Amino acid sequence: MTANYKIDAMTELRKFLWNQLKEYSIFDPEEYYSDNLGKEIIPILPVQQSAEMNQFLSGKKHIVYDKIGMSYEDNWAVCCEQILFTIYSVDVTDINEIRNFMTDEFRRMDDSAKDVRLSGLVSDKIKFFSIYVADISPTSPSEELQGFLSADVVLEIKYSRILDNSGRFI
């Protein structure tokens, strides 16, 4: 059996976060519908985004994410990662709302991971053990996007990939 190396805890967590942000009406997916693509654009984007995407998101709140640290513990089956989410908006109220939601959703460590696991939204090839808020930055003018404010939320996650009998990813 060949492992699917495209599965990544960070992108699986993104699926869950997007669903929750929609469910709590923090984001309206209709505001992110692209006529050019004929589909909804998920405004939680990897750090390398195209100029076209910046133009599409002009003036719209969105989140950019990246992996900022990864290591395995003494138990080599458990991975520990830090994921940086940078929230952008022209309105400080939007940033506060998203930051407060993420704090509430992910501060509960094992229970936060359980919610993600049981959501049915993430791959069954990853098991989340713990998710918590490791750091939150204050809101400030964005250095990357003129006219936007930004704030960072760093989540630390512990998880494992489901393994075969030899300890390799399934």
Question: For each predicted feature, which ranges?
Answer:
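Extracellular/virion structural assembly segments
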Residues: 76-79, 90-116
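Short, charged interaction patches at domain edges and termini
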Residues: 1-23, 68-78, 122-170
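Short connector loops at helix/strand junctions that flank enzyme active sites
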Residues: 58-60, 78-82, 150
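Short glycine-rich, low-complexity/disordered patches
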Residues: 25-39, 112-132
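Active-site-adjacent structural patch at catalytic or cofactor/ligand-binding sites
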Residues: 66-68, 78-90
